[in-house]
Structures are given as structure tokens and as C-alpha cells.
Amino acid sequence: MKADIHPTYAETTVLCGCGNTFQTRSTKDGGRIVVEVCSQCHPFYTGKQKILDSGGRVARFEKRYGKRKAGAEKAESADK
């Protein structure tokens, strides 16, 4: 391997939006990574279903297209 071409692989602290912190290793400078969700608060791991709205995107989508049921559109097109 060539010398001085690989980034340093150092201990890094990951800080989640829920307040959970854990240690890992990364090549990112600064020693700190901030994330919105982690395994402690992600709905897949916790079993809780909630909408994670990043910047109002879900609200903007619902405003534009309205709240629709998944099977309602298919049933209407089948009746025609």
C-alpha cells in the first residue's frame, strides 16, 4: 500500500436527535457526527409508526395531493 494516501480512521461520537450517543470509527474530520434518527428512535427498530417530517415535506405533499386511501383510487378506476 502507498504511504500517506489513506485518511485517518479515528474514534467518532455519533449524536442522534433523540439524545442518544454512541461511539464508532469514521474518517470524518472533527470526531462528531450528528444524525436525525438512530436505532433507538427509528420506527423500524422501535415498532412505533410515526412520520418523520424533514422540513415540512410530508405536509407539503398532503396539501398538494390530499390524504388519499391506498385502495380508493384503484376501486374508482375499476368501476369505470
UniProtKB/Swiss-Prot annotation:
Binds 1 zinc ion per subunit. GO terms for cellular component: ribonucleoprotein complex; ribosome. Its cofactor is Zn(2+). Keywords: Metal-binding, Ribonucleoprotein, Ribosomal protein, RNA-binding, rRNA-binding, Zinc. Gene3D superfamilies: Ribosomal protein L31. GO terms for molecular function: metal ion binding; rRNA binding; structural constituent of ribosome. Pfam families: Ribosomal_L31. GO terms for biological process: translation. Coiled coil: none annotated. Zn(2+) binds at C16, C18, C38, C41. Binds the 23S rRNA. HAMAP family: Ribosomal_bL31_1. Part of the 50S ribosomal subunit. Belongs to the bacterial ribosomal protein bL31 family. Type A subfamily. This is Large ribosomal subunit protein bL31. The gene is rpmE.
